[in-house]
Amino acid sequence: IAAMRTLEGKIPGLRVVPLKSVYPQGGEKVLIYHLTGQKVPEGKLPLDVGCIVCNCTTVAALAQYIQTGMPLVRKCVTVDGSAVRTPGNFWVPIGTPMSFVFGEAGGFSEPPQKLLYGGPMMGIAVPDAEQPILKNTNAILAFGAKEAHAPPMTACIHCGRCVNHCPFGLRSTDIAAAFRAGDGAALERLHVSVCMECGCCA
């Protein structure tokens, strides 16, 4: 942060704003709200409120392309999870199979039961380790048997903590009930399309 702040006076319009490291602070609409005070309306895009959100990797790749003509051909990928022998960050050519990258991290300490593109909260499950690293792959995770299986669901006690933790104040218990009932009209009334699937309510 200190290094970035040295550039504030040198680049017109640049302002460095440190934010608390609280999940899901990196969510696009969450960032916009905390930086500008604006809420992106339901069904709208950041551009509709005058914002463009780019992560650091994208900005760095754009700068490299402008300066050298070299397109994005590799990514820095975090390799982690309970089944990974030696977690770490690795520069990986796009298109490399996940199996090769896991091998570079020492292989598996136990047979993986779940593989993910992305983080543990919003990652996407993949069927096998032969899936390629993509240009938007920031992390790959491998979990053993203990972490791979969700605990049994328990009955809601209506404590309201899920609503308090939702960055958009959605009523997740009502959304879940409407989903189970197949009530599309209720889901629309509950603004289910605003949900970013961050998992905070769970």
What are these regions (language model features)?
Residues 137-153, 163, 167-202:
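Ferredoxin-type iron-sulfur electron-transfer modules in oxidoreductases and energy-metabolism complexes
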Residues 1, 111-113, 173:
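Glycine-rich phosphate/pyrophosphate-binding loops
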Residues 2-10, 125-132, 202:
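Short glycine/threonine-rich loop-to-helix capping motif typified by GTGT followed
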Residues 19, 80-82, 93, 116-118, ...:
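Generic beta-strand/beta-sheet core signal
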Residues 24-26, 30-36, 106-160:
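Active-site gating/interface segments in enzymes
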Residues 1-98, 104-109:
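Hydrophobic alpha-helical positions that pack around
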Residues 16, 74-76, 109-118, 185-190, ...:
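Flexible, glycine/charged-enriched surface loops at secondary-structure junctions
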